Amino acid sequence: MDDRMSNVDPKLLELLVCPLTKGRLSYDRTHNELISESARLAYPIRDGVPIMLISEARKIEE
């Protein structure tokens, strides 16, 4: 099974929030991640499942 999602359901994005800040997330299709701009974290999506663990998130450097 491909671990890339072709699309993230907009309703899912409305429901999910960053576990650290409780802020909104955006989908980064290039890296297949959910981005929390306020926390500067990127949460991976594996096998179509968002991994919403702070310990699994990648820090955004820019």
UniProtKB/Swiss-Prot annotation:
A GO term from the CC aspect: cytosol
Coiled coil: none
Matches recorded under Gene3D superfamilies: 2.20.25.10
Taxonomic superkingdom: Bacteria
PANTHER family in alphabetical order: PROTEIN PREY, MITOCHONDRIAL, ZGC:162634
UniProt family annotation: Belongs to the UPF0434 family.
UniProt-recorded name of the protein: UPF0434 protein Atu3696
Source organism (scientific name): Agrobacterium fabrum (strain C58 / ATCC 33970) (Agrobacterium tumefaciens (strain C58))
